[in-house]
């Protein structure tokens, strides 16, 4: 399989070279990506569901205090029969079929998550919206980060991927409204599809490719 060529730029946004990205990670065809949109949707839905707190709660008529006494006798008053002032039709009565605490998380196989990420990255790469940047930042500087990203992303919303050693670069971009910084071991399908551009640092790109392509020890 032929690899995908990604541009590498410097701190001023000038092209300095290219890197070869594995086709399996960045070069899936547009037709194949289109065919797997349901998979991407399922993985993203599961990710968003897992992020839900699920602590919502309402009280049923059995949980609301009071209401243990029948408000008036069954017959002879001319009024509608009532058994409790905490029945749902009463003011301050219990809630019927209201939300209760629950776990929204779904089980998603690792292979499905990995495949969805490949398709999402390939979709961005097919559109020319994946790049590698060498920031060269030695101390936190938002101005320097903007100068490096602007020629590539044109101020569109961008996910920038770092290694945990790229702390100065991470600190430099975290205050940019159109940038979502993320560490390479946290890269996921949702953050890719919600961004118009995906930018890797050189170290993050190498770490990502190595983690996805090198065989794991038994």
Curated annotation (Swiss-Prot):
InterPro entries: Ribosomal_uL4, Ribosomal_uL4-like, Ribosomal_uL4_dom_sf. Residues 55-83 are annotated as: Disordered. This is Large ribosomal subunit protein uL4. Gene3D superfamilies: 3.40.1370.10. One of its GO terms (biological process) is translation. Pfam families: Ribosomal_L4. Belongs to the universal ribosomal protein uL4 family. One of the primary rRNA binding proteins, this protein initially binds near the 5'-end of the 23S rRNA. It is important during the early stages of 50S assembly. It makes multiple contacts with different domains of the 23S rRNA in the assembled 50S subunit and ribosome. Coiled coil: none annotated. GO terms for cellular component: ribonucleoprotein complex; ribosome. Keywords: Ribonucleoprotein, Ribosomal protein, RNA-binding, rRNA-binding. GO terms for molecular function: rRNA binding; structural constituent of ribosome. HAMAP family: Ribosomal_uL4_B. Part of the 50S ribosomal subunit. It comes from the Bacteria.
